[in-house]
Curated annotation (Swiss-Prot):
Listed SUPFAM superfamilies: Growth factor receptor domain (SSF57184)
Listed name of the protein: R-spondin-4
Biased composition regions of type Basic and acidic residues, renumbered to the chain: 217-227
Disulfide bonds: 35-41, 38-47, 50-69, 73-88, 91-98, 95-104, 107-118, 122-135, 139-181, 150-157, 190-196
Region (Disordered): 190-234
Family: Belongs to the R-spondin family.
Pfam families noted in UniProt: Furin-like_2
PTM annotation, UniProt: Tyr-112 may be phosphorylated; however as this position is probably extracellular, the vivo relevance is not proven.
Domain annotation TSP type-1: ranges: 138-197
Gene coding for it: RSPO4
Amino acid sequence: MRAPLCLLLLVAHAVDMLALNRRKKQVGTGLGGNCTGCIICSEENGCSTCQQRLFLFIRREGIRQYGKCLHDCPPGYFGIRGQEVNRCKKCGATCESCFSQDFCIRCKRQFYLYKGKCLPTCPPGTLAHQNTRECQGECELGPWGGWSPCTHNGKTCGSAWGLESRVREAGRAGHEEAATCQVLSESRKCPIQRPCPGERSPGQKKGRKDRRPRKDRKLDRRLDVRPRQPGLQP
């Protein structure tokens, strides 16, 4: 009877030791391994509760997730402090790093940072800095250029009125590290030389008769009467 009883006691002791070791793994005190900084930790899922002031970062790999306690959230995440646990949350899709969900610090490629937002292009009046990916400062606009030739449908003649325009470019548009600022332009109405060179004026048509008053035409005919030569019969 003693042998089976001793064997039963040994099995019970082994089960107790196994349960104790499992509890030790699940309750970490920050002494090392993947449970550093954890209050509750499991071998399968890592940390689920962190020590005070630390942030819980959940890394997802497929359907599995693994928790880790960090002093600072990794790039692409920002920290939110809560009553029970501090968590790391992912930044917006266009942010490389952020201060909060609505305020980016650095943008991903093809986007520019402007007042905490990541935009595909910088707004008018700002310069796009290619190295920092930021929209910086106000554009320094240069003076207005000269007026263009007055044209109508691409021609400088043949019409009564046309349009002329001028532009005002940014003073720093040639900066190597900056994109061109928005160019300002304005147009105004202008008179055009109505007949083009070599063309008849609109009032002159081919084969048009003399439209002077009849009495003037008769006077010209009277003045054009030539004296008859002697010996010629009428």
